[in-house]
């Protein structure tokens, strides 16, 4: 039994809940990002954000909305093709759902690592497609899904669809998986190193790890996203870092390689 049962279908929730959650979670971060009490947790100063970022917030919002429109269309098609409206979907035991969840995480990580890395290595793709995401040199939460539309389709939307299909999860399980993936992705771009943050505590691949990738020195490292750093470690693209306190307040993710 889930709260939406009897009101909307699992397929509808799987399509729109992650989008709504994105704006709630990222919007919450955006509201507090420039509050003075949180200055001591920032990975970059306000001045750095204003000076280094090459795109304004309204353009970022428009870009994210466009990606989410495409994402919703693909999700509706995917559920329409894979769901049997005449059959009663029986949820597997929790242990099976947990296994499917883990499989989906590993599949999504694998897909995104290799596509992401190739977009950096292919000069044409980087210049014309992936560089749009790196206009945010100082990442912030709302910009987590700020991508070129083609990258958004290939990296995030197709990656999510493949994770769903390979794992064999039901539409209901996918609601929780895609919402979790959205929360993790937003948190990885939040630009704040917060105490008691569960994502930053449990995952080595977190906002500081991804911040290194957005720096010039780390742009060819730390491709892994959104969950683990497995592929970076296996294939030699892992860049370690020290998290140091800045004298003027806040933190800095300082790469350890020259």
Curated annotation (Swiss-Prot):
Residues 101-237 form the Fatty acid hydroxylase domain. InterPro entries: Fatty_acid_hydroxylase (IPR006694), Sterol_Desaturase_Related (IPR050307). Its main location: endoplasmic reticulum. Expressed ubiquitously. GO terms for biological process: lipid biosynthetic process. It is an enzyme of class 4 (lyase). One of its GO terms (molecular function) is iron ion binding. It is a multi-pass membrane protein. Keywords: Endoplasmic reticulum, Lyase, Membrane, NADP, Transmembrane, Transmembrane helix. It catalyses: a long-chain fatty aldehyde + 2 NADPH + O2 + H(+) = a long-chain alkane + formate + 2 NADP(+) + H2O. The chain crosses the membrane at residues 13-33, 63-83, 88-108, 149-169, 175-195. One of its GO terms (cellular component) is endoplasmic reticulum membrane. The keyword Protease does not apply. It is found in: Endoplasmic reticulum membrane. Its EC number is 4.1.99.5. Pfam families: FA_hydroxylase. Homodimer. Belongs to the sterol desaturase family. Aldehyde decarbonylase involved in the conversion of aldehydes to alkanes. Core component of a very-long-chain alkane synthesis complex. This is Very-long-chain aldehyde decarbonylase GL1-9. The gene is GL1-9.
């Amino acid at each position: 039994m889930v709260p939406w049962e009897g009101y909307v279908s699992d397929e509808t929730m799987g399509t729109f809940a992650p989008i709504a959650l994105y704006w709630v979670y990222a919007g919450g971060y955006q509201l507090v990002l420039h509050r003075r009490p949180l200055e001591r947790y920032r990975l970059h100063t306000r001045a750095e954000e204003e000076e280094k970022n090459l795109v304004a917030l309204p353009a970022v919002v428009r870009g994210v909305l466009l990606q989410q429109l495409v994402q919703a269309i693909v999700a509706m098609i995917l559920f329409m093709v894979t769901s049997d409206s005449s059959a009663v979907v029986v949820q597997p035991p929790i242990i099976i759902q947990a296994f499917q969840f883990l499989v989906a995480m590993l599949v999504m990580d694998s897909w995104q690592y290799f596509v992401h890395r190739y977009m950096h290595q292919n000069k044409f793709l980087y210049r014309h497609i992936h560089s749009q995401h790196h206009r945010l040199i100082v990442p912030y939460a709302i910009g987590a899904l700020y991508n070129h539309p083609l990258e958004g389709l290939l990296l995030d939307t197709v990656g999510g669809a493949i994770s769903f299909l390979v794992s064999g999860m039901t539409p209901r399980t996918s609601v929780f998986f895609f919402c979790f993936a959205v929360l993790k992705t937003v948190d990885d771009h939040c630009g704040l190193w917060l105490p008691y943050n569960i994502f930053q505590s449990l995952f080595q691949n977190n906002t500081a790890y991804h911040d290194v990738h957005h720096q010039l020195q780390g742009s060819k490292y730390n491709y892994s996203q959104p969950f683990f750093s497995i592929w970076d470690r296996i294939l030699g693209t892992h860049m370690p870092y020290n998290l140091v306190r800045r004298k003027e307040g806040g933190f800095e993710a300082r790469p350890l390689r020259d």
